[in-house]
Amino acid sequence: MRSKQYNLVNLTMNLFKSLLFFIVLLVLSRLIPHPPNFTPLIAGAVFLPFMLKDRTLIIVGLPILCLFISDLIIGFHSLMLWTYGAFLIIGLTVFNISKLNLRTLLGLSLASPTIFYVISNFGVWLTAATYTKDLNGLLECYVLALPFYGNSLVSTVLFSLVFFLTRHLVITRSKSKFI
């Protein structure tokens, strides 16, 4: 009985350390110099819900918490509602998927930056005086945001694969210790 309790505590501590590592990584990724929209944040929103066997909705909020912590440091902005809303929709979408495999991961890694691009740039168009409030202005906003979208796509696919492969290696390594 005692070894089962120890294993549960050890597992809980390892999970806590992993989640803390992800939070620090995601926050730091916004604080260090990087190309625009080239961070692991969307990949974190895609991957984090799969870290827990018995998932809860709290895991959906972790990327938003990371955004909030980094916004405390770098400053709040007028598009926070659109940004946080996009991450909430991404998180809820991912949360409803039960099994992670490479095909699912790649699909989510392409869909999630697209969700972010559509929502956040709609917010830019709606709130910025730069664009006319008609279809031409909306299209102009989306076209001018394409380089940022490209960075989001590449970084999300790249970081999602890194997270997925790291998870696979850790699971394989931990299983081999007990066999």
Label for each model-derived stretch:
Residues 1-12:
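N-terminal amphipathic/basic-hydrophobic helices that include classical n-h-c signal peptides
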Residues 11-51, 57-58:
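Hydrophobic transmembrane alpha-helices
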Residues 16-21, 57-61, 81-85, 106-110, ...:
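Hydrophobic alpha-helical transmembrane segments
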Residues 24-27, 47, 64-68, 106, ...:
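Residue-level signature of the transmembrane alpha-helical core
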Residues 28, 48-54, 92-101, 165-172:
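Structural signal for the C-terminal ends of transmembrane alpha-helices
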Residues 29-39, 63-96:
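Interfacial aromatic-anchored transmembrane helix boundaries in multi-pass membrane proteins
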Residues 62-63, 82-121:
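Short helix-perturbing small/polar motifs within transmembrane alpha-helices
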Residues 102-179:
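Membrane-embedded alpha-helical hairpins and interfacial helices in multi-pass inner-membrane proteins
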